[in-house]
Curated annotation (Swiss-Prot):
InterPro entries: FadA, Thiolase, Thiolase-like, Thiolase-like_sf_Thiolase, Thiolase_acyl_enz_int_AS, Thiolase_AS, Thiolase_C, Thiolase_CS. NCBIfam families: AcCoA-C-Actrans, fadA, PRK08947.1. The gene is fadA. Catalyzes the final step of fatty acid oxidation in which acetyl-CoA is released and the CoA ester of a fatty acid two carbons shorter is formed. GO terms for molecular function: acetyl-CoA C-acyltransferase activity. It catalyses: an acyl-CoA + acetyl-CoA = a 3-oxoacyl-CoA + CoA. Pathway: Lipid metabolism; fatty acid beta-oxidation. It comes from Pseudomonas fragi. It holds the Pfam family Thiolase_C. This is 3-ketoacyl-CoA thiolase.
Amino acid sequence: MSLNPRDVVIVDFGRTPMGRSKGGMHRNTRAEDMSAHLISKVLERNSKVDPGEVEDVIWGCVNQTLEQGWNIARMASLMTQIPHTSAAQTVSRLCGSSMSALHTAAQAIMTGNGDVFVVGGVEHMGHVSMMHGVDPNPHMSLYAAKASGMMGLTAEMLGKMHGISREQQDAFAVRSHQLAHKATVEGKFKDEIIPMQGYDENGFLKIFDYDETIRPDTTLESLAALKPAFNPKGGTVTAGTSSQITDGASCMIVMSAQRAKDLGLEPLAVIRSMAVAGVDPAIMGYGPVPATQKALKRAGLNMADIDFIELNEAFAAQALPVLKDLKVLDKMNEKVNLHGGAIALGHPFGCSGARISGTLLNVMKQNGGTFGLSTMCIGLGQGIATVFERV
């Protein structure tokens, strides 16, 4: 494949094991430490990359307060081998934060404003709860329905609009856990999970190299017993069909194609297009549809050209309508989230965009795909998408 010098390539990707936010493996690890450990280890395994060449560390994080405050990108960067002369910024596009971090780095590379970037994101939802310090403007209800800020209710709305049944949602959730467990057992996550110290349920310190969030014993029967989590009367969305509240971080090394070539590196993929889009906040989960349509148009592709897809599983009731309208629902088992998704692995807000993108690149590498799409919905009505081509 012939690459242009300013094409944007992904050199490597790593992530932490995903930990449960309630009493999980990361309960005694701070978000900055988690991020710094991950960045350091990813750089260590790419010895041809001089940390001094890093132009900027761009880190996604949603709730930027407590240990995640004061520009956590810089806080983490200072605790790594990256010199103080490299810059760092923290970005937030809610659920799409670390994918936005990737886009920001890509746009800088394309315009000649740097050659080497470290991007990713973190969210420690056990230490900094999703609503900590949040004070929504009461006047917002004049412009958008109050329930638009309640993600579970927006999923209920989207599922109802598209005729998604409780049974379909439960089956989707079981699939997520089964595929994530299968990927774990078969070593499919080995290249992406960076082992970390953590604490087991008995309080013993150990090395984790697997996601503790996956529940392989999940069944249709066990999910059917759960009560609706957001709309007690007539709702279909349960805790079992929603993304898990978890702690985790993800990291990528992103470069210009020319710099990667100069260093003798073999990239995982090149970015072919990027897009963001807005939708009515009441159906925030629909955002991946217009974002994907824009990204495909910019890449000169259509859905039939896409070999593999990673769609963030915010809710089964949200993911299924998106797949339906992208015309890939009937191809889900061949193309979509082949290693499970956020229902099994969790959705640490600031981490997820780079996480699903990196997992996608590994799926493409393991299965020989050419084009891949990573996309996700974003709270308050947005979507974000990236199209990759395997190098």
